[in-house]
Amino acid sequence: MAERDQLEVDVLFVGAGPASLAGAIRLRQLAEEHKRDVSVMVIEKGGEIGNHGISGAVLDPRAIKELLPDWLERGAPVESPVTSDALWFMSEHGKIKAPIVPPMMNNSGKYVASLQKLAKWMGEQAEAAGADVFASFPGQELLWDDDRVIGVRVGDKGIDHEGKPKSNFEPGPDLLAKIVVLGEGPRGTLAKQAIAKLKLDEGKDPMVYAVGIKEIWQCPPGTVKAGSVIHTLGYPSGGTFGGGFIYGMAGDLLDIGFVVGLDYADPTTDPHYLFQRFKAHPAIAPMLKDAKLLRYGAKAIPEGGLYAMPRPFADGLLITGDSAGFLNGMRLKGVHLAMKSGMLAAETASAALGADAYEENGLALYEENFKRSWAFDELHTARNFHQGFDGGTIACLLYTSDAADDLTR
């Protein structure tokens, strides 16, 4: 059997999403500032950077402006600034448009963006900054020295459906790193290994998840207003946590999706069926008339909030983005928080490299800096959003409106 190669790197980011790519860019910026030779690698399981990002999101630019103040001048691929906001309360046969958009759903100054295009562009920015970015490198398991993470084993190639080597078998390399930063998205393979082994969720609330289902439709020319944003509550989710969204993108593309909390009480609840009913609603169906479905997908969404976030550091390890629960369910946004978490992880890694100290006592700076950041303030404000739905939609809106007032004071 072929030998397994070993590669050494200072900092290894796993998963080429907004968190890891922002972290890689920030770490290379700090290396240049301090005139240090810091090797940074990002690995991604998808065949291309951005493959796992389903198009369509409302991007809060706060974090990316901090990271790259000239991000738009560099050609960041946004579809459109948000041009209109609406909140619809849905019944089975009709809708009521809210007279005002609640503060937490106000998207003035935000951008409708394609996550797929944005991740690809950020990967290019990371490479230009000096990081190595590799697609088709799935992290299979963490490498350990007792309870310290020392690297990642990449998945083997050339194996059959039973996991047995074929004639073209090629063992995945072992990537050894002083610090491993996990940004795999929700319930990431390696993050689950680390959280379970090191009990990083001990003393935390259980993480609660939702499933977000999304489709991209090509609509007839002139029928989609780029930058339009609509969120919905009510039908067809009933008393279940969730709601819909419709984002207008450039080129008459329509991003339509539905979120359903996976803690639903009715065991017969079918999120995909609810999404089909949502699209058939008389307020939604006309938008899809003569349209063609281009892409579809679904992902888990960590909705547990601040008190369900695991401890995001250990010996040789940092956890970022959705893997660590950096998502604001109240605003239905996580990209900016993922970026900020990656930047905070990069700043922690830079300090650790400077001190040649990679144990958890040194990497605890990550959590300390998070608690001093605007990201913590935002997540603290939204800490009970999901639980608020237990009292019904109206009670939750009253809570979130009050919480949003706190955030904007």
Q: What are the roles of these predicted feature ranges?
A:
Residues 11-36:
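N-terminal Rossmann-like FAD-binding beta1-loop-alpha1 element of flavoenzymes
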Residues 30-52:
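Glycine-rich FAD pyrophosphate-binding loop
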Residues 46-92:
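N-terminal FAD cofactor-binding segment of flavoenzymes
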Residues 105-124, 265-269:
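Short beta-strand to alpha-helix junction loop
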Residues 128-283:
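Predominantly flavin-linked oxidoreductase catalytic cores and closely associated redox partners
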Residues 300-320, 325:
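FAD-binding beta-loop-beta segment adjacent to the flavin cofactor pocket
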Residues 347-391:
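Active-site-proximal substrate-binding core of FAD-dependent oxidoreductases
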Residues 399-408:
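Single conserved hydrophobic/aromatic residue that forms the stacking wall/gate
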